């Protein structure tokens, strides 16, 4: 959601008066400056669909499972040439099966499969079997000790992540945690993650953030949320729910059992570091510990591994249960990245892997290797709405009334602005982000600066946008509102840079530009392009204004409290303010559909996995929702494990 919501705390800016003499510059573009298209070009309109829903996803673009000996030797692909997009694997207690999550049914749709690995030495699985596949998230599967039941997490029936158990013989499944006794406050985090069976099959341990606070990173100042997890247990029939371990100010995740069932081990990390753990600029400095407690009492706390490094995915090996036995775990993100063992009997293995899990005898380890190459423009995605075909786009897509698509090439280029046909063909450069010499190339490379949120004029002749430093670099950088001709021949600055200004939108009649200011002043401003006069529409910490197609209202994001942002609308004369969302989590980056509905991104259903497990993301809980202009009829349009945002409907008439 950060690619779409990213501009509230990290991108708010405002400005109010401007010199009438704006900077005017002739664009001198060199064809060599044109960013790489990376586009799946010319995809036709989908048969039987109304058109395409373009959206952006922040998450890995590839993930492949591997199996190796515990010492790292004899590594091979688990699925051989049958690999698709798989992750989060685990062995059955008898070592005969590996359960894993796969998106082979569509990019973004996570389902659970298993394969037989009794002949692991030959390097590949056999007997590939689908366990559960629905449009909801299914993840983190774990087989019971007797092999008859599957514990897993799912967002089915309410979109929040809960612990489920499925009978493998009958297919019957039940939700263990979404009950009146267990479910937390619906306005607070209420997710349940990473189930693990006790050796006797009598208990399932898991982590949960139920009834914790929505808390921003940076001591509550950041837009993106941290996560506070405790360890809980429940019986497979849904009874006996209780807390096993908790620690104020800390996140306790991925619990696993000792082989005699007397202790539970987990990783322990500060709540603040759950943000740093999935940010590439900070993960190397994160420290965590591997800790266990007595299951019955929650006491007798033992630290098995501590010191520098982010340590995760602990798992007991060899059957011993005292403080000197062997626990395997992952080190993520620093120079020692790979997997390690507390006993020292097996040497540490340096490897760029994620989510390792070991066979119960400790002989084999399974894990994934992920890639983050940007998805191609127009790459097909899983579609949750049968009327629309979902495809990938770079950020800030907008369709002109003439049917031309404009985007910022943040993932596929250098945050310049390009236009194209909606099928990805006929790519043209509108504005090179380096044209004015204002941007720091290092910040552009990190995605912290660029030409953001291009918006069309009604006649398709102009594109307005913000140019400058964004996110955390906004605090010391500048940003101005610009516009450029759609053919890239000319551009001009519309604000003078005195106040950080950005995220503009054209009025339907083409006379006005709405934008936000941040820093010296806050709020939404409206610039009259004929007179160059500016007036204040709001004076709060508002952001991301967008004019409705009929010009009667603007939708925007408002900071309604120190920890929460909501979607609001207002008339262009400043009257009739309406707050349309109230989830308790962030709701933001709203845009209008052509028929006057509102698309936006939301964290209202909470995290889909433990926050520290993610990589290179901002708000991994972000999903896309559509609602009517008055805030009614809210409906989820995505249900993935990843950060989804930047929606745009493209009707078939523009794709043929």
Language-model features: locations:
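Fungal secretory targeting signals
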Residues: 1-21
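Beta-strand-rich domains and repeat architectures in extracellular enzymes and scaffolds
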Residues: 31-70, 74, 83-90, 393-398
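Residue-level detector of Asp-centered blade-edge/turn motifs that repeat once per structural unit
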Residues: 47-49, 93-94, 145-146, 199-200, ...
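Hydrophobic beta-strand positions that form the internal "hydrophobic ladder"
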Residues: 53, 98, 150, 204, ...
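A flexible loop/linker signature enriched in serine peptidases of the S9 family
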Residues: 57-64, 80-85, 101-113, 131-137, ...
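Short loop/turn segments that connect beta-strands within beta-propeller blades
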Residues: 69-73, 116-121, 167-171, 235-239, ...
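Conserved beta-strand position repeated once per blade in WD40 beta-propeller domains
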Residues: 88-90, 140-142, 194-196, 254-256, ...
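Blade-level signature of beta-propeller repeat domains, shared across WD40, Kelch, NHL, RCC1
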Residues: 619-656
């Amino acid at each position: 959601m950060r690619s779409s919501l990213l501009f509230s705390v990290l991108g708010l800016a405002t400005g109010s008066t401007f010199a009438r003499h704006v900077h005017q510059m002739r664009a001198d573009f060199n064809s060599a400056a044109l960013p790489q298209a990376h586009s799946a070009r010319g995809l036709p309109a989908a048969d039987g669909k109304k058109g395409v829903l373009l959206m952006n996803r922040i998450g890995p673009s590839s993930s492949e499972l591997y199996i190796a000996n515990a010492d790292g030797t004899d590594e091979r692909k688990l699925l051989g040439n049958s690999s698709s997009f798989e992750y989060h694997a685990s062995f059955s207690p008898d070592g005969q099966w590996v359960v894993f999550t796969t998106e082979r049914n569509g990019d973004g749709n996570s389902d659970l499969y298993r394969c037989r690995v009794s002949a692991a030495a030959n390097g590949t699985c056999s007997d590939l079997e689908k366990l559960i596949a629905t449009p909801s998230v299914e993840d983190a599967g774990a087989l019971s000790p007797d092999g008859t039941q599957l514990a897993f997490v799912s967002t089915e029936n309410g979109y929040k992540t809960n612990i489920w158990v499925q009978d493998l013989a009958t297919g019957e499944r039940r939700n263990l945690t979404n009950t009146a006794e267990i479910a937390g406050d619906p306005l607070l985090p209420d997710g349940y993650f990473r189930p693990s069976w006790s050796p006797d099959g009598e208990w399932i341990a898991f982590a949960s953030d139920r009834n914790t606070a929505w808390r921003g990173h940076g001591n509550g100042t950041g837009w993106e949320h941290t996560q506070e997890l405790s360890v809980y247990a429940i019986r497979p029939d849904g009874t006996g729910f209780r807390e096993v371990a908790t620690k104020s100010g800390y996140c306790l995740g991925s619990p696993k059992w000792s082989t005699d069932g007397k202790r539970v081990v987990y990783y322990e990390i500060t709540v603040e570091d759950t943000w740093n753990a999935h940010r590439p600029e900070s993960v190397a400095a994160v420290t965590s510990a591997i800790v266990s407690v007595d299951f019955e009492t929650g006491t007798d706390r033992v630290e098995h591994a501590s010191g520098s490094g982010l340590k995760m995915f602990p798992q007991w090996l060899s059957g011993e249960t005292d403080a000197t036995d062997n626990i395997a775990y992952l080190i993520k993100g620093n120079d020692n990245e790979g997997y390690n063992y507390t006993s020292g009997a097996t040497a540490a293995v340096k490897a760029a892997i994620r989510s390792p899990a070991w066979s119960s005898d400790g002989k084999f380890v399974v894990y994934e290797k992920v890639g983050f190459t940007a998805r191609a423009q127009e790459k097909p995605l899983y579609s949750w709405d049968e009327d629309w075909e979902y495809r990938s786009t770079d950020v800030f897509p907008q369709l002109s009334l003439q049917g031309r698509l404009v985007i910022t090439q943040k993932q596929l280029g250098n945050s310049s602005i390009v236009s194209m046909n909606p099928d990805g063909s006929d790519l043209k450069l509108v504005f090179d982000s380096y044209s004015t010499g204002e941007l720091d190339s290092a910040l552009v490379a990190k995605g912290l600066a660029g030409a953001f949120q291009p918006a069309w004029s009604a006649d398709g002749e102009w594109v307005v946008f913000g140019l400058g430093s964004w996110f955390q670099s906004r605090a010391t950088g500048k940003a101005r509102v610009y516009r450029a001709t759609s053919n890239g021949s000319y551009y001009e600055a519309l604000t003078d840079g005195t106040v950080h200004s950005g995220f503009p939108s054209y009025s339907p009649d083409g006379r006005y530009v709405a934008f936000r200011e941040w820093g010296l002043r806050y709020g939404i401003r409206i610039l009259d392009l004929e007179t160059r006069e500016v007036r204040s529409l709001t004076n709060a910490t508002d952001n991301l204004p967008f004019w409705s197609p009929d010009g009667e209202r603007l939708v925007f994001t408002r900071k309604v409290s120190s920890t929460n942002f909501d979607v609001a609308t207002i008339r262009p004369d400043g009257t009739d303010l309406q707050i349309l969302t109230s989830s308790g989590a962030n709701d933001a980056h709203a845009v209008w559909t052509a028929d006057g509905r509102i698309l936006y991104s939301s964290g209202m259903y909470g995290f889909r996995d433990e926050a520290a497990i993610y990589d290179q993301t901002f708000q991994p809980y972000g999903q896309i929702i559509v609602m009517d202009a008055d805030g009614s009829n809210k409906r989820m349009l995505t249900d993935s494990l990843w950060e989804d945002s930047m929606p745009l409907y493209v009707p078939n008439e523009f794709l043929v």
